[in-house]
Amino acid sequence: MSECVVRGGQVVQAGGVVSADVAIEDGRISAIGPELPGAKREINARGLTVFPGVIDDHLHFNEPGRTEWEGAATGSRALAAGGGTAFFDMPLNSTPCTVDRAAFAGKRAALERASIADFALWGGIVPGNLSELAPLAESGVIGFKAFLSDSGLPEFPRADDLTLYEGMREAARLGLPVAVHAESEEITSRLTRRARDAGRTSARDYLDSRPVIAEVEAIHRAALLAREAGCKLHIVHISSGRGVAAALEARTMGTDIAIETCAHYLFFTEDDLLRLGAIAKCAPPLRDRQEFDRLWAHVLGGIVDVVASDHSPAPPAMKTGDDFFAIWGGIAGVQSTLAVLLEAGHFQRGLRLERIAELTAGYPARRFALHNKGSIAVGNDADLTLVDMDGQENLEPESLWQKHPVNPYTGNSFRGSIRRTMLRGTTIFNHDEITVKSGGQLLRPKANTYATSGIHP
């Protein structure tokens, strides 16, 4: 007799959606099939759709050091409420930044105390820390992150071209990928300075200071350096259809490049930024309707590999001011990635459920060598999200689990109601309640087993 059976759900697998039970033993899936034998504990999933737990490969929980912005305790609860079971925390916005072994150890300890979801940690590439990349790899980072433009934090300076190239060569030797924030510093900084010197500091001026060409140029440059270095490349938060096209062109030229976008680029346009204001400020910024539609075409066409949240919260006071350039740029959305893909993707555009599972779980697990995560298969961790596809969620500030109710998604309705989230067979979220206090574990990838980009079932 199994420990647990999730009974009678519509199970989303790579090959399609099947009616099946899912048996769980010792935190792992032990069987999948119709009418499995009884278990010590049964969860009724009849009428529900069972997805693999969301793996958010790009977010900022600010732990340790800036927990007044968020923290893993509240952040991981918001993740779980959105169907998430694992996350990859970026190396900046915490204090200290994760650019050496000691910082990694401190962040790992903080997350083990506070997180209810499993986690992996990105290390950083900044000028002067090349010798720290090997110790970070030994500690267990999932990969390395670099900025081509100003990060907004002086303690995490952007990587100049030589720093990036040498970092990529070292990452390739270590068998780990490099993630890049792709915006041209030359273009964005000079346009920003020109606007501010002229006293133009509105939201429209901010949008104009970060044009699509700044993203496209930086993607091409990062791809060239990665190709020369023999490094796997991960372009984070691509905001535009032209940006995806640039990454795809690099792939055809031999760059092993993964293409990530974020839920907010698939739900909002620049018109929403002008309407909502700083709550919707991010970098790269939201784009016009043409780029929005092009980006969706790449998602629907199977070109985009992964959709993340880039959850980057801040206290309300940091999201106000007369100078739009000075306001903190980051969107809080960790609770909404699956909701966006269900509403804007499946219900509005016909995006297949198995494609949603691939974008949110299958690809990040495969790409980052988390071989027991990302899909509902025998032997994998029982990381499951149960969704009532006939339900509807009206996202209001009081339904948010993040620390501050500063969120552009509030006031919107999403078809598909997340009813339960399970991590390794344990329910961590159930019917609007968090059911555990901790339990998240560090995910350590196996170096040199990362999947090649562009490979989808």
Curated annotation (Swiss-Prot):
Keyword set includes Metal-binding: yes
EC top class named in words: hydrolase
Bound cofactor: record note: Binds 2 Zn(2+) ions per subunit.
Binding-site residues, Zn(2+) 1: 58, 60, 145, 310
Modified residues (N6-carboxylysine): 145
GO biological process, one term: allantoin catabolic process
EC number: 3.5.2.5
Pathway: Nitrogen metabolism; (S)-allantoin degradation; allantoate from (S)-allantoin: step 1/1
GO CC entries: cytoplasm
GO molecular function terms attached to this record: allantoinase activity; cobalt ion binding; zinc ion binding
Superkingdom to which the source organism belongs: Bacteria
Catalyses which reaction(s): (S)-allantoin + H2O = allantoate + H(+)
Listed PANTHER family: ALLANTOINASE (PTHR43668:SF4)
Function: Catalyzes the conversion of allantoin (5-ureidohydantoin) to allantoic acid by hydrolytic cleavage of the five-member hydantoin ring.
Quaternary structure and partners: Homotetramer.
Protein name: Allantoinase
Organism: Solibacter usitatus (strain Ellin6076)
